[in-house]
From Swiss-Prot:
One GO CC term on file: NADH dehydrogenase complex
Top EC class for this record: translocase
Main function: NDH shuttles electrons from NAD(P)H:plastoquinone, via FMN and iron-sulfur (Fe-S) centers, to quinones in the photosynthetic chain and possibly in a chloroplast respiratory chain. The immediate electron acceptor for the enzyme in this species is believed to be plastoquinone. Couples the redox reaction to proton translocation, and thus conserves the redox energy in a proton gradient.
Provenance organism: Trachelium caeruleum
Entry-linked InterPro entries: NAD(P)H_OxRDtase_bac/plastid, NADH_UbQ/plastoQ_OxRdtase_su3, NDAH_ubi_oxred_su3_sf
Entry's Gene Ontology molecular function annotations: NADH dehydrogenase (ubiquinone) activity; quinone binding
Keywords carried by this UniProt record: Chloroplast, Membrane, NAD, NADP, Plastid, Plastoquinone, Quinone, Thylakoid, Translocase, Transmembrane, Transmembrane helix, Transport
Name under which the protein is recorded: NAD(P)H-quinone oxidoreductase subunit 3, chloroplastic
GO biological process, one term: photosynthesis, light reaction
Transmembrane segments annotated in the record for this chain: 9-29, 62-82, 88-108
Gene: ndhC
Quaternary state and interactors: NDH is composed of at least 16 different subunits, 5 of which are encoded in the nucleus.
Gene3D superfamilies on file: NADH:ubiquinone/plastoquinone oxidoreductase, chain 3
Family, as annotated: Belongs to the complex I subunit 3 family.
Length: 120
């Protein structure tokens, strides 16, 4: 019976953290002015009226560079906590992290060989 009371704080935070965004979305929908005019359908570019067609097609190279960046950014997210607790975790976790980095290096070499990192 005592163990059920230990989760009261968890459930309170879960309910409150769920209600706050729902309430914010509800209030913004109720209080926001509804106006449909030509300004709503024009694109906004730093306060300057757009000239010509606002729809541009980006080259696939931008996406490839972004994808490679995201992969190595996620690598940093995983390796930083590991490096901070390296002395506590031991050798087995070092081997796992080494295999993780090795897989990422193989992926980088593969992307390099396929020409994904070539700009022109």
């Amino acid at each position: 019976m005592l163990l059920l009371y230990e989760y009261d704080i968890f459930w309170a935070f879960l309910i409150i953290s769920s209600l706050i965004p729902i309430l914010a979305f509800f209030l913004s929908g109720v209080l926001a002015p509804i106006s449909k005019g030509p300004e709503k359908f024009s694109s906004y570019e730093s306060g300057i009226e757009p000239i010509g067609d606002a729809w541009l097609q980006f080259r696939i190279r931008y996406y490839m560079f972004a994808l490679v960046f995201v992969v190595f950014d996620v690598e940093t997210v995983f390796l930083y906590p590991w490096s901070m607790s390296f002395d506590v975790l031991g050798v087995s976790v070092f081997i796992e992290a080494f295999i993780f980095v090795l897989i990422l290096i193989v992926g980088l070499v593969y992307a390099w060989r396929k020409g994904a990192l070539e700009w022109s």
